[in-house]
């Protein structure tokens, strides 16, 4: 297939994003308008506020993406957009905008699964990466360990049965008074603490899955904090978050390594916002090196929600002839591998 230039749009949560991507791996622009400062005062994302801010920002974000890329609508071969999972109101803003563009410009519309987008972020930073490989997807809303069999073809080996890892980070951060967003704040404070100070539980299911559970360790942290407060004992917040982080990171690492062994894979790619966590990166690199497993991370800008990853995933769908109808609707509970 000749060079394909895709304009991608992402609005699944609290970032309004647009990007221009060539052949799935070359990013000409990647513009993100974040609402994090707005939602911080609420202690988390407020869906209605997020939707309104997307409406206000989306036109300017798309125009900037085209300008930075040095292209016009005439140069675009397809319009890609996230249609799930995510906040339904937020998804609809991006989806309706993309539909309008695709219809008015007579361009193909490609709906992209947000989680698949996170996985595809690795194709941008690692130009020679090709399936098969193992991918650990860790974000505020999702935690999966996946065997990527081919472009757009996934086998879910393990997933969370309750809280996502990033969600647990946010809840623990709130409990110790760090506020939102929890992940980066815990990562920073944990560097000052002793990760062996408190033994928090790690969930290990005695079945044939490599599923995750983070509600137990989250509850253990909350119980520890309550007990310390009842005793009027001083709480070392750095030790608490370092010990919590260690429990989460070790489970994520263990299951990713086990998946490599099960599927005889020699590469692990990391995806999602928690992929920026320094302890997770260090632990995976260390354990991977011991076993001859190459560990790959996207750059921090590609770990967060962005449209470049959506443009990358869309390209590989376009190669297979998978384009969407104008009747495409938002699917807030869309699962990995579903259409």
Swiss-Prot record:
<dbReference type="InterPro" id="IPR022450">
    <property type="entry name" value="TsaD"/>
</dbReference>
<feature type="binding site">
    <location>
        <position position="305"/>
    </location>
    <ligand>
        <name>Fe cation</name>
    </ligand>
</feature>
<dbReference type="GO" id="GO:0002949">
    <property type="term" value="P:tRNA threonylcarbamoyladenosine modification"/>
</dbReference>
<keyword id="KW-0408">Iron</keyword>
<comment type="function">
    <text>Required for the formation of a threonylcarbamoyl group on adenosine at position 37 (t(6)A37) in tRNAs that read codons beginning with adenine. Is involved in the transfer of the threonylcarbamoyl moiety of threonylcarbamoyl-AMP (TC-AMP) to the N6 group of A37, together with TsaE and TsaB. TsaD likely plays a direct catalytic role in this reaction.</text>
</comment>
<keyword id="KW-0012">Acyltransferase</keyword>
<keyword id="KW-0808">Transferase</keyword>
<dbReference type="InterPro" id="IPR000905">
    <property type="entry name" value="Gcp-like_dom"/>
</dbReference>
<dbReference type="Pfam" id="PF00814">
    <property type="entry name" value="TsaD"/>
</dbReference>
<comment type="similarity">
    <text>Belongs to the KAE1 / TsaD family.</text>
</comment>
<dbReference type="GO" id="GO:0061711">
    <property type="term" value="F:N(6)-L-threonylcarbamoyladenine synthase activity"/>
</dbReference>
<feature type="binding site">
    <location>
        <position position="114"/>
    </location>
    <ligand>
        <name>Fe cation</name>
    </ligand>
</feature>
<feature type="binding site">
    <location>
        <begin position="137"/>
        <end position="141"/>
    </location>
    <ligand>
        <name>substrate</name>
    </ligand>
</feature>
<feature type="binding site">
    <location>
        <position position="170"/>
    </location>
    <ligand>
        <name>substrate</name>
    </ligand>
</feature>
<keyword id="KW-0479">Metal-binding</keyword>
<feature type="binding site">
    <location>
        <position position="118"/>
    </location>
    <ligand>
        <name>Fe cation</name>
    </ligand>
</feature>
<keyword id="KW-0819">tRNA processing</keyword>
<feature type="binding site">
    <location>
        <position position="187"/>
    </location>
    <ligand>
        <name>substrate</name>
    </ligand>
</feature>
<dbReference type="InterPro" id="IPR017860">
    <property type="entry name" value="Peptidase_M22_CS"/>
</dbReference>
<protein>
    <recommendedName>
        <fullName>tRNA N6-adenosine threonylcarbamoyltransferase</fullName>
        <ecNumber>2.3.1.234</ecNumber>
    </recommendedName>
</protein>
<dbReference type="GO" id="GO:0005737">
    <property type="term" value="C:cytoplasm"/>
</dbReference>
<feature type="binding site">
    <location>
        <position position="277"/>
    </location>
    <ligand>
        <name>substrate</name>
    </ligand>
</feature>
<dbReference type="InterPro" id="IPR043129">
    <property type="entry name" value="ATPase_NBD"/>
</dbReference>
<dbReference type="GO" id="GO:0005506">
    <property type="term" value="F:iron ion binding"/>
</dbReference>
<dbReference type="InterPro" id="IPR017861">
    <property type="entry name" value="KAE1/TsaD"/>
</dbReference>
<feature type="binding site">
    <location>
        <position position="183"/>
    </location>
    <ligand>
        <name>substrate</name>
    </ligand>
</feature>
<keyword id="KW-0963">Cytoplasm</keyword>
């Amino acid at each position: 297939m000749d060079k394909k230039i895709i304009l991608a749009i992402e609005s699944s949560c609290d970032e309004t994003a647009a990007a221009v991507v060539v052949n799935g791996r070359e990013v000409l622009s990647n513009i993100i308008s974040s609402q994090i400062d707005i939602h911080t005062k609420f202690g988390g994302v407020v869906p209605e506020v997020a939707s309104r801010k997307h409406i206000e920002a989306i036109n300017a974000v798309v125009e900037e993406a085209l300008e930075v890329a040095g292209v016009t609508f005439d140069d675009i071969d397809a319009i890609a957009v996230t249609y799930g999972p995510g906040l339904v109101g937020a998804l609809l803003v991006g989806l309706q905008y993309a539909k309008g563009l695709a219809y008015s410009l007579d361009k193909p519309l490609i709906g992209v699964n947000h989680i698949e987008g996170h996985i595809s972020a690795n194709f941008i930073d690692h130009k020679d990466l090709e399936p098969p490989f193992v991918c650990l997807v860790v974000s505020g809303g999702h935690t999966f360990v996946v065997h990527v069999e081919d472009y757009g073809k996934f086998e879910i080996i393990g997933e969370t049965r309750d809280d996502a890892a990033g969600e647990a980070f946010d809840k623990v951060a709130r409990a110790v008074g760090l506020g939102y967003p929890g992940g980066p704040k815990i990562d920073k404070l944990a560097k000052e603490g002793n990760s062996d100070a408190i033994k928090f539980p790690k969930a290990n299911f005695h079945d044939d899955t490599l599923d995750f559970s983070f509600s137990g360790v989250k509850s253990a942290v909350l119980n520890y904090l309550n007990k310390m407060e009842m005793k009027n004992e001083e709480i070392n917040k750095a030790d608490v978050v370092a010990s919590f982080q260690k429990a989460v990171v070790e489970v994520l690492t263990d299951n990713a390594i086990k998946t490599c062994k099960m599927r005889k894979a020699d590469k692990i790619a990391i995806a999602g916002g928690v992929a920026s966590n320094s302890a997770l990166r260090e632990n995976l690199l260390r354990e991977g090196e011991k076993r001859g497993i190459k560990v790959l991370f996207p750059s921090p800008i590609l770990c967060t929600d962005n449209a470049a990853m959506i443009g990358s995933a869309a390209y590989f769908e376009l190669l297979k002839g998978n384009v969407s109808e104008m009747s495409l609707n938002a699917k807030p509970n869309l699962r990995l591998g579903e259409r």
